[in-house]
């Protein structure tokens, strides 16, 4: 319980001072996915994830505790990319700050989001 409270406190602290995360292009993300060298976090919500789908290999973000379980065996130097709906959406920060609070050092943002992914002609995976 203490670990959970500490994790929540860190996430809140990071949220308060969180700046922008470096952007990653659709091309670079696609290369990282094909190489198996990235964790992709979808922050669009269960309804969107179920109806529309997610970027291939993406894990669905619901909360920091669930993300901690999903990424428990992942090396901390792994590239982590969070995304949401598109350029004007900032929900991705929930997933990015949670990953950062878990100790991941290479956290990026796909600012194009799922809408940019689709606009680029890329396919989604069903959840």
Predicted regions, residues:
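Rhodanese-like catalytic fold shared by cysteine-dependent sulfurtransferases
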Residues: 2-4, 16-27, 35-38, 47-79, ...
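Hydrophobic h-region of N-terminal signal peptides that target proteins for export
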Residues: 9-17
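Glycine-rich, flexible N-terminal cofactor/catalytic loop recognition
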Residues: 32
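Structural scaffold elements adjacent to functional motifs in cytosolic proteins
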Residues: 40-42
